[in-house]
A protein has these predicted regions:
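Short, Lys/Arg-enriched N-terminal segment that forms or immediately precedes the first helix
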Residues: 3-18
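Anion-recognition interface
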Residues: 21
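Long, charge-rich, low-complexity alpha-helical segments
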Residues: 24-109
Length: 109
């Protein structure tokens, strides 16, 4: 069975896309990231979330940029801390997107 980590149901959370197995919307996950919450912080505060589920929420936002435009930096990356390279290494390849799921590389000085 394949799990769809981001779901949308008009009868749940007023139709706002949410993370499977939780009552957190994609918007709430993005707000937490923009406010500086790391992956470890999110999992500690919301143990019902899964590493791949959070990554899917970030990828969903990237695929729906118009809906979540306020969470994107000018360079196209999501605001706030992303996954470290070590954390992202455990994810399926389609989620290892620099600047979206994985922390954006710092520009060379």
């Amino acid at each position: 069975m394949t799990i769809k980590w981001v779901k949308s149901d008009p009868l749940v959370m007023n139709g706002e896309p949410f993370c499977y197995g939780s009552r957190l919307t994609v918007r709430q996950v993005l707000q937490a990231r923009a406010n500086g919450m790391t992956l470890v912080d999110m999992l500690k505060d919301h143990p019902e979330l899964r590493v791949v589920g959070i990554a899917e929420a970030y990828a969903f936002a990237a695929d729906n940029r118009d809906r979540y435009a306020e969470f994107f930096e000018r360079n196209g990356s999501l605001a706030g801390p992303g996954y470290s390279a070590a954390e992202a290494a455990r994810l399926p390849a389609q989620y290892r997107v620099p600047g979206i799921v994985v922390k954006a590389a710092k520009p060379a000085a």
